[in-house]
Amino acid sequence: MLVCGKGFLKCRAPGVPFFCDKRKSFFTKTKRGFHSLPLGTGVRVYFNNNLRYSSNSIEVVEKAAINMGSKEDKADNPALSSYDDAMEALSTLISRRNRGDRTPTKGNRDKLEQVVTYLKILDLEDKIKELKVIHVAGTKGKGSTCVFSEAILRNCGFRTGMFTSPHLIDVRERFRIDGLDISEEKFLQYFWECWKLLKEKAVDGLTMPPLFQFLTVLAFKIFVCEKVDVAVIEVGLGGKLDSTNVIQKPVVCGIASLGMDHMDILGNTLADIAFHKAGIFKPQIPAFTVPQLSEAMDVLQKTANNLEVPLEVVAPLEPKKLDGVTLGLSGDHQLVNAGLAVSLSRCWLQRTGNWKKIFPNESKETEIPVAFCRGLATARLHGRAQVVHDVVSDPQDSSDSMETPCGDLIFYLDGAHSPESMEACGRWFSSAVRGDKSLSTAVNGYMRHGEYGTDLNRVSKQILLFNCMEVRDPQVLLPKLVTTCASSGTHFSRALFVPSMSTYNKVISGASAIPSDTRRKDLTWQFRLQRLWEKSIQGTDAGLDHTLKPDGITALPPHDFLCGDAPQCGGPAGTPVTSSAVMPSLPLTINWLRDCVRRNPSLKLEVLVTGSLHLVGDVLRLLKR
């Protein structure tokens, strides 16, 4: 447990819980007690179990850091100023086209040829051939698969590099070395080296690369210079024409679960999407995938046959094989991703000649080595099935007493934005909120706790905080979430729809100032989401106020708005009661939720944040402040 107070970070039983099932302990026990680390040293502390695990031992090292403060407070810091300059430079590479205006990728290989040209300019074309790459594509679960694979191989003693997308708070999240985001110093070193060389060559018709292409070549630059043993590369979008597909001879390829997403670019059928994903297959290079619908599987198998690729379908990991260890990423669906990661990691070790060196006594393919279990248990990925207990205090209390988590406001964050991932999100959230309520009884969407402490009537309410991009289909996403949760006995008391805080035409850092949201925003999209929600819940939107103008909301709902009961899907007909609200801004919404639990200490709010990774990242930024 990490508690911040009086200028020190106090670590209670530092590290992670012990894995003692079946008398096996994966972590060296440490003496319980408080240990203090001075704050204000420029190091960053993430309070959400973002831990570093040494590649050479089982030692667990807390990833230290604190909020760097506002941009203004650090204006005279050369390192931070240079980092802001880098963010400004990156922002100039963002395409101004809307996603719906993108040209379909079929048959167009100009983009890959450009990436190869940029690699030549940076003298990386031949050097990246020496990288031992695991290349992963997919619709749902490719990021988790990469994280599991990286953690497994790091715990086997290898120096790891991992490139994933998108980032939630800071662009450095996309580049991990040995399980940690690359440092600002190294990021700036490699960034400016690439930037200056490419800028010098941006003549005679060769332009600077778009943002993702630049980040891709930057990742290769980092991994080559850092001399990683393994580079785990996540496809950005699709596969066949993705910027990462300049990798000609990966060690092994993986395809995570496929579904309907990015249809404006990849096509409107599952077969079209599978065609693009299978584009990362290389002749005679082993590939693994998970169980797929037949329409997708047929395309994957046909592509594999044409390229003489040995393609293996991997079953979800059986929990009993973990010997009592819990996966580091929550949700039953992660067993699918973990199974794929185990196969990818095992194949990588075998093809690089390391398997027998590290595991000379492991003869059975079905057994999972202890180092693999350790990696699976310690994998971390922000914004996917992540739980954050907010620290709520009285702003009028000026005493020096330490802030303590009151347990009244808990955020459940998952960046689900496709029908398949929304269903998985609903199952995870329902399971998570039931986890500590086994002694309680559900009453119309909330839980009454009478077994502990002096609060005999503690009320838990499930709240939805939602936004999605306009290219998504909320008519599919919202009903999928509602029905999945309802089937598990979880009903949302209220739903809150918020506008985006992210600036899509600018790359920001974790230390960037948060927008003040003083300007009124166009909330037309949020009102549409609200109408779809009310129809999903009550079959009508008659309870909504249609006189409100989309740009006219400045007020927040009364605090007792959250005290109502959860409406039941398909309930008896009658006068509908509005179970949702459109909020003017995200920062105001977070403060309003905090005010609600301050005013009612017996209220426990369990807030599911989903629909967009951008929304999840924005909430995490606000919770860090």
Curated annotation (Swiss-Prot):
The keyword Metal-binding applies. Keywords: ATP-binding, Ligase, Magnesium, Membrane, Metal-binding, Mitochondrion, Mitochondrion inner membrane, Nucleotide-binding, One-carbon metabolism. A monovalent cation. GO terms for molecular function: ATP binding; metal ion binding; tetrahydrofolylpolyglutamate synthase activity. One of its GO terms (cellular component) is mitochondrial inner membrane. PROSITE patterns: FOLYLPOLYGLU_SYNT_2. Mg(2+) 1 binds at residues 165, 234. InterPro entries: Folylpolyglutamate_synth, Folylpolyglutamate_synth_CS, Mur-like_cat_sf, Mur_ligase_C_dom_sf. It is found in: Mitochondrion inner membrane; Mitochondrion matrix. SUPFAM superfamilies: MurD-like peptide ligases, catalytic domain, MurD-like peptide ligases, peptide-binding domain. The keyword DNA-binding does not apply. It catalyses: (6S)-5,6,7,8-tetrahydrofolyl-(gamma-L-Glu)(n) + L-glutamate + ATP = (6S)-5,6,7,8-tetrahydrofolyl-(gamma-L-Glu)(n+1) + ADP + phosphate + H(+). It is an enzyme of class 6 (ligase). Disruption phenotype: Vegetative phenotype does not differ visually from wild-type. No obvious defects in root development. Polyglutamylated folates still detectable, but loss of activity leads to a significant reduction (45%) in total foliar folate abundance compared to wild-type. The reduced total folate content is a result of reduced levels of 5-formyl-THF, 10-formyl and 5,10-methenyl-THF, 5-methyl-THF and THF (42, 42, 53 and 48%, respectively) compared to wild-type. The plastid and mitochondrial folate levels are also reduced by approximately 50 and 55%, respectively compared to wild-type. ATP binds at residues 141-144, 384, 414. Pathway: Cofactor biosynthesis; tetrahydrofolylpolyglutamate biosynthesis. One of its GO terms (biological process) is seedling development. Its EC number is 6.3.2.17. Its cofactor is a monovalent cation. It comes from the Eukaryota. Mg(2+) 2 binds at residue 262. Belongs to the folylpolyglutamate synthase family. Catalyzes conversion of folates to polyglutamate derivatives allowing concentration of folate compounds in the cell and the intracellular retention of these cofactors, which are important substrates for most of the folate-dependent enzymes that are involved in one-carbon transfer reactions involved in purine, pyrimidine and amino acid synthesis. Essential for organellar and whole-plant folate homeostasis. This is Folylpolyglutamate synthase. It comes from Arabidopsis thaliana (Mouse-ear cress).
